[in-house]
Amino acid sequence: MSSRKLTLGVSLKMYFGYQQTLDWCQKIHEIAEQHPLASLPSARLFVLPAFPTLAPVVQRFAQSPVHVGAQDLHWTDNGAFTGEVSGTMLHEMGCRYVEIGHAERRRYFGETDEHFALKTAAAWRNGLTPVLCVGEEQRGSTQQAIDTCQAQLAAALNLAQKQQLTGDLVLAYEPQWAIGSTEPAPTAYISEVCQALKQHLPTQAGVREGRIIYGGSAGPGLLSQLGDAVDGLFLGRFAHDPAAFNAIMDEAFTLSSQA
């Protein structure tokens, strides 16, 4: 069987209610338990639910091939930070991943590259794998997109590198202009950007294992079209239907068999 890296992740953002999240996770658990993709050593599956559901979701997936992560974390490990959650607590409760750098954090909460550098360092310091989102705001040339993403990656890793921290990293390429749209960015465009990022990521100090996934209106067929340019997909609303997530798993497994 192929050792090709394959990663499928889902962020539920704030779309689901509490019970709806638990019901969805139960269905995903049932799918993953029986799907051949989940048994591949090189496959990674993760879900990022809302904070109030993390404890029961971690418990639900405790004996499952699906890992759980958070959609954010604070950059310090404890202290008087009302409303915040530390990487220390996330790791203690069983989280494996944490999302950092999403465009919505920039747009709605004023977060900057400096915040993302602090959070990336906090994630590695606490044994969490950052799902680091990068992407250009406006569509231009692929080289402009590559330059933007590489600059965002360098900024996010800057502090962790200074502190000589190491860890795994999932780099999620999400062109901001494609997030929430009805169609993803053109396949050739995504492929060129992700290929460049895939070659660039191993050169970054501190990154033990790096994976490149695409997000931004990702759906069925895209993984096959992108081929080796990406290691997987970062899914949003499409995966709200468990059957749709199952279809993406089918596609990923087929690709692993052909590699």
From Swiss-Prot:
Enzyme class: isomerase
Pathway: Carbohydrate metabolism
Disulfide pairings: none
One GO molecular-function entry: triose-phosphate isomerase activity
Family annotation (CDD domains): TIM (cd00311)
InterPro entries in the record: Aldolase_TIM, TIM_sf, Triosephosphate_isomerase
Alphabetically ordered keywords of this record: Carbohydrate metabolism, Isomerase
Active site: H102 (electrophile), E174 (proton acceptor)
Gene Ontology CC annotations of this record: cytosol
UniProt xrefs under Pfam families: TIM
Catalytic activity: L-erythrulose 1-phosphate = D-erythrulose 4-phosphate
Gene Ontology biological process terms, A to Z: gluconeogenesis; glyceraldehyde-3-phosphate biosynthetic process; glycerol catabolic process; glycolytic process
Enzyme Commission identifier(s): 5.3.1.33
Domain of life: Bacteria
Role, per record: Involved in catabolism of D-apiose. Catalyzes the isomerization of L-erythrulose 1-phosphate to D-erythrulose 4-phosphate.
Record-stated family: Belongs to the triosephosphate isomerase family.
Protein name according to UniProt: L-erythrulose-1-phosphate isomerase
The organism of origin for this protein: Pectobacterium atrosepticum (strain SCRI 1043 / ATCC BAA-672) (Erwinia carotovora subsp. atroseptica)
Gene name for this UniProt entry: lerI
